[in-house]
Amino acid sequence: MAYDEDDGEINFNELVGNLLSSHNQEGQEEGEVQGGEQEGDDFEKIYPTSENIEPKHPDDSQHMHNSPDQNIEIPHFVDEEDELVSVVANAVQNIDDEQAKPENHLENGSEHVTSDTADDNHEKEQQQEWAHILQQEILKSDGEPLRENTERRVSTSQHHPSQRTDDALDQDDENLRMAILESLQELNTNEEEEKEPEKHEHAAPNDKLSSKKSSKKKKKDKSKNRESSKDKSSKKSKSSSHSKKHAKDRNKEKQSKPTNNENTLDLSNILENLIHENDNAAIDTAKQTVDIQDNSHTDNTNNEDVEAQALVEATLKAFENELLSSAPTEEPSQEQSIGPVSSRKAVEPPRKPTADDIPLAMLQAFKPKKRPPQEKKKTKSKTSKAASTANKSPASESTSKKKKKKKTVKESNKSQEAYEDDEFSRILADMVNQVVNTSLKETSTHTATQDNKLESESDFTSPVQSQYTTEDASTANDDSLDLNQIMQNAMAMVFQNQNDDEFDENIVEDFNRGLGDLSVSDLLPHDNLSRMEKKSVPKSSSKSEKKTAISRRASKKASRDASSVELTEVPSKPKKPSKTEVSLEKKLRKKYVSIANEAASVARKKRWAKNKELKEKEKLERQTAREERRHKKKLEKQRLAEEQEELKKIVERGPPYPPDLRLTKSGKPKKPYRRWTPEELLKRSQEAEKPRKVKKERKKKEKKMKVPSSALKKIPLFNFVKGNVQPSARHRLNDIEGSLSTIGLHKSPDGVRRILSRPKSEDHEWPLSDSSASQNYDAHLKTVVHKEKIPFHPPWTIPSQPPFALPVARRKKIPNIKKYRKRTNNSFRVSKEGTASTRNRILPAILLPIINTLKAAAKSQTAAGATPEEARKRLATIIQHAKSTVIRAALQARKNSMQAAHSKGTTTELATTASRMKNPLKMIPIFNTSRVKQQLDKQLPARSAGTEISSSESPDKATPDPHSNSTIAGHTLKGVTTPIKIEDSDANVPPVSIAVSTIEPSQDKLELTKRAESVEPVENNVETAKETQSVQEIKENVGTKASEEVTLTEDKTNGDPKNEKRILIESPVEKTDKKKPGEKIATDLNEDASLSDKKDGDEKSTLHSDAAQLTGNEPDSVNTTTGKPKLIDVSLKPLNEAKPKIPIIFPLKRPQIKPEVSVINLVQNLVNTKIPEIKNESVDLGSNITDILSSTITNILPEITATDVKNYQYEDENVKYLKKTPRQVLNLDGLVPPSGRCITKAKRVRRIKKLSADATTAPEADGKANSESITYTFDIPSPEEVQSKRSVVLKFAKARLTEAELSCLKKEINNVRKRRWREMNSTKNWEYDVKSRLKKRANAFFGEGESETKSKWIEERFQEKVSQEKYKDRLETTETQANNTKIVIDDKEILNILAVNMNNLNKARCIEKDIQESFREEKLASLQPKKKRKKSILH
């Protein structure tokens, strides 16, 4: 809206300036001014008639502008004149836009009458204000400089005789100008004094804003200028509609008031004010105008054609509007933007203004603008300089004319109805035709001169404008009318014999009101309107700036020509051929629009009602459907609940279940219980019939073996050794020998000599000449291969001199893939010596050859392709052979060492050997000895009739006692009686002691230092014997040589002298000789006695003999006789030469022995347990065999003292075994090779076992067995009394225990049941094991086949094993339990498990109480059987 108001302000300013300048130029007198006012009044009265002529103006103006007479040179004017010319050009164009609107409103006039009459009163009030503002602006802008400008223009116009049409229109211009000024003066007289200061405030900001906008938009390019011209024209057309309404008001005032010459304006004062204002504005912007003028000059040169055309159209329309609408005082802010409008501006259709928009636009025109006043001067100076260079105006005029012509065709169709019924229009058309005909004759003489001008300026036209000029070239000569002549004739005819009284004032007002809102935009298509209105707002300011570049002369000429052409060409516009098509449609629309609207409203209401009903219906349907769904869900829920209840009852009854019940894979009903639907049953049956898809086994891709390069190097190219390949594999190889024979190698030294001696010329012939000769290969000759000696050849052929081996190329070192961490300073480095020592600790030296043998055997077996079972059997046989070899080697080594020690016969050597054996190597057993423990146990209970000899100290120390247990060790080492238990088949034989008859009386003088101490009971000895981890059964030849060996062992216990013991053990080992056994023994004993006498002076120590006491099961069996033992001569007792089995202990761990337990006791116990086994095997041994065995074994074993036990490091301790790289070990029988990391063994707590009360049986009880031994007594009824198969305890436990406790109790019951099952099966398993081993032994003796002797032997051996008491009990229990396949745990045991295992005695007692109470109630109820029967019958 603001841009529209600015355009309106510019129009008035430019129009008045143009009129004033023409008035001063001609110097008209006062009378002429009055005549002009009279003419203006007349024109105002006939304003409606001239409005009808308007729609054809654009076409007429185009014809006139295309005529060659319009190409007149425009003189160069100064800046002030250019400013006035631009003002007039803009004003005239804007007024023409205003006149385009009324025609369109002829059709819609009836619609706007009510709105216009309502606003008339308000607009009249505004007119007086605007008139006052306009007058003040004219006084300011059109001051004294206008006189000087007009004088200059007169002088310059005399130098240009070509513009002879200027003088013709001066009189008309003056008349019109005076009419306008008079109307302004009359409107403003009443309120001039009140509104004057207020209007000054409004004008100043408007000037700033317009000048600011124009200066900014000057810089835009040519394309933007063309687009902006459309917007400008639309806004001007809007403003023109306002001016027409105000003109109607002024017409009323003029008819009521007489015209007074006294009210005319003083033109000299107006010019002075204008000059004064322009000078002040120019001073402030002097510096800026220079740059902007240069820019505008360049822009205007590009847009000259467009702007010239716009100027012509603007002047034409402005002059015509001035004729028709007396004094347009609509937009009084005159000094707003003075910029030019582009050529496309007038063509663009503006928005159609409504009755509401018009007063708002008028009011907003007076809002203060913020643009500074300096910019107004800037734009004026720019446009004035650019206008001086405008020489291309005719060419540019043709473009806008053509566009006007095209658009007015549409306008004519819309305005045909208005022309049809208007008689006044027809009369005016005839009059104009007459004027045009007369003017054609006068203007025909000017065509020749204007053609020359058009040709000279055609070079400057733009490409776009040249297209339009060529199209209009044919009509240019036809329409070359003199606008000046047409206007003069038209005015003369219009105002001839016309009086103001003849016209009815109401008719004029109605006609003006009908045309008030008509604009060009109403005649254009709406799609063009919408597109152009979007562009109109932002580009309006730039378009107003582009008109000032056109010279004053061109604008004058254009205005005259346009006005004359428009008046003459109007009558030819209305065309009736197309009137019927459009008007019929519009008439029908107007006729039936009310009926159609009424029908549409009725139909709309019906549709609303119908839609409402449909929505209600849909809502009800949805609601019913929702209720149905809910009901179905509820029924389904109830059905499922009923089915669940039914199925629960079925499940509680137990199997068999119905076929449609869902079951798990195990056959139990699946929760939640559900039946299969018929569809699911059908599907399951079909799936069962279908064959199952066989899953394809994915074949694992075999990984390609990576052959190392070192192996590839070793592959020979040719196998020259014929016998190297097996005959079976010869057919797989290629024909290597055949290929070698074709090569022609020289295999003899003669051939090599010939190669060296042959001339070079024979090189190419030599291989072929000697290839047929057979040569032998000499392996001693080496071929030195160089790369250059082997010529290049195809790979499928053999070179002339092939090498015997490939050259070995140097290879780059392959980087180590495995990255080792940097060794830190704190890391422990293990040396080779350390690894060797740790290996020796873990693996004794005796086992290394065995292990290497086993490894080699395993490698050979696996290399041969044997299966793991075959390799295992092979290694088993090797281990069996290794056993016997190791036993033989160990026996031989010990025998040799004993013989060497005996031959030397020195106690020092014996002491050193004993000290060496104190720290033996840790031995790892090669074979299993797990049955040794059982063999030890099975012999102890059978021997209950053993006797014991205890030594007593003599009361008289001086008297020697040959039968006493203590002797003098200083004189003899062998004259000591050693009490030994001789186990014979006879249990009543008293114990004997072996003594020597040669005892000197001097021995009685020595004192006895120690008293024999009794040994701990047999139970301790048996337990310590069991704790030793391994026992080896070794065969030893006892009868090879009779020898006696004395071993000195010391037992030191915490340094206590009381516990110190010096034990002399006499263990003569005799070799029986068939000829003289007694003699041999006697001589040996005498020799040993003489050796011991020599050692007596140095030792000076008392020896004490320790008697081993063996006790049976009963304490009464211990014999404590103090009588003299019977001497038995060794020579009298026959000795057997058989080789008995003697068990020797090789400890894996250091035995855990109490300090008071001596080694000799252990040895004697072992011997005593093994001798009966030997006797059972029908081996005849001497009575002194136990003595021999115990002495021999004691010599082998080292002494174990308390300090040794204390200082000994067990394997349990945390010892780190560090190894860099573990030795590669074959994974035999699933054994995992040791890892390379340090393995820290977990420290095990040594468990001390308590001795059981019965010494014959070893404690085998488990931890859980011990816990079961603690039992409580519970008084609950037996299952027979309760008469229930199920456990009553569990039934009552559910009420007392939580779920977790109940599940735990069930687990404990299960564990006890399983443990009992294993115990019951262990005896059976032992029986099967014994029978299978006996069968293996029988197969070795009797062969694989079955025979009576074989089965009889197996049965006998088995009965011998079973006859022992230990196994009798087991067999009896197994026989009783054989029938009971189930292991039943009764209720009392369950309560014990709850009390002991779960540590919950209180709840066990509560359950016991509950069971008793329930049992009592049942008994009471059973006393009344009749009532129960009646109830049951009724029930």
From Swiss-Prot:
Residues 211-223, 235-249, 367-383, 665-674, 692-706 have a biased composition (Basic residues). Residues 171-190 form the UIM domain. Interacts with PRP8 and RAP1. It comes from the Eukaryota. Pfam families: DUF3020. The keyword Phosphoprotein applies. This is Protein SPP41. Residues 53-63, 98-127, 139-154, 196-205, 224-234, 345-355, 524-548, 610-628, 637-652, 676-691, 1005-1014, 1033-1082, 1091-1103 have a biased composition (Basic and acidic residues). It comes from Saccharomyces cerevisiae (strain ATCC 204508 / S288c) (Baker's yeast). There is a cross-link at K981, K1154 (Glycyl lysine isopeptide (Lys-Gly) (interchain with G-Cter in SUMO)). InterPro entries: HMG_box_dom, SPP41_DUF3020, UIM_dom. Residues 286-301, 442-451, 459-482, 1021-1032, 1108-1123 have a biased composition (Polar residues). A motif (Nuclear localization signal) lies at residues 683-699. It is found in: Nucleus. GO terms for cellular component: cytosol; nucleus.
